Structures are given as C-alpha cells and as structure tokens.
From Swiss-Prot:
Top-level taxon in the UniProt lineage: Bacteria
GO molecular function, one term: Gly-tRNA(Ala) deacylase activity
Gly-cisPro motif, important for rejection of L-amino acids, short sequence motif: residues: 137-138
NCBIfam families, per the entry: D-aminoacyl-tRNA deacylase (TIGR00256)
Protein name per the record: D-aminoacyl-tRNA deacylase
Pfam family, one: Tyr_Deacylase
Keywords on record: Cytoplasm, Hydrolase, RNA-binding, tRNA-binding
EC number: 3.1.1.96
Gene that produces this protein: dtd
Amino acid sequence: MIALIQRVTRASVTVEDEVTGEIGPGLLVLLGVEKEDDEQKANRLCERVLGYRIFSDADGKMNLNVQQAGGSVLVVSQFTLAADTERGMRPSFSGGAAPDRAQALYEYFVERCRQQAINTQTGRFAADMQVELVNDGPVTFWLQV
C-alpha cells in the first residue's frame, strides 16, 4: 500500500462539478492499493501517515504530526501509484489490486483515519477527479508498507 502525502495549506477534490472533499491546513493523501495489500497494511500505513511528523513546531522544526498541528486529511484514491514504470514507455498496472478489493481497502483506510478523531475528507473511488492543492513547503513524501 502506497501513500503519497503532501503538506498543504488547502486542498479540494471535485467530481462532476461537485466538491466531494475540502480541507484547510493538513495532508493530501494520494492512496494506491497493491495486489498483496490487506487490512494489516492499511492499519500500518494509516498509523504512519497520521503519525508522520512533517509540521513545524514553535521552533520551526518538523516535529508535529497532522493531529498535533490541528490539521485535516483529504484522502484521494490513485491507482496509478501502483504502476510498474521500470520498462518501456507505457506504465503497467498489473501490480494494482482488483477494483473491488482496492475500494474496500481505500474505505477501510478512510475509516481508520476518522476513528483517530481527525477531520477526514475524501474523493470518490474510481471517479475522474480534479484535485486542487496548495503544497506547503513544498513538503511531499512517499510512504509504502
């Protein structure tokens, strides 16, 4: 399971001209689900994402996680993160989970975030989405479990 996380001052996702999720300061999480992923991996990744200390403390040091910083989370499914790009000029998506399994794990990940009392917004699984964000820093990390 893969999360590309970006520290943002704001972010939103729109599907068919409808804003489905919008946050102020916090994390934009682009989430990719791979074939071998399960709930245990989703738990570990959620713990890492929410615990990752990439927000500045009073001394300007990256020392706070999203909850400590009072931030929110916007989770957007992105199957392209599971692409194999090592060869050729066209990515292979054979490493991605089947759509039904990927959706179940995506929804599980979102629910785990919400259980941590963090404002968690979402896109719409498998939809064509427009994501807008203001990357703060920029600060972007690739997390994989």
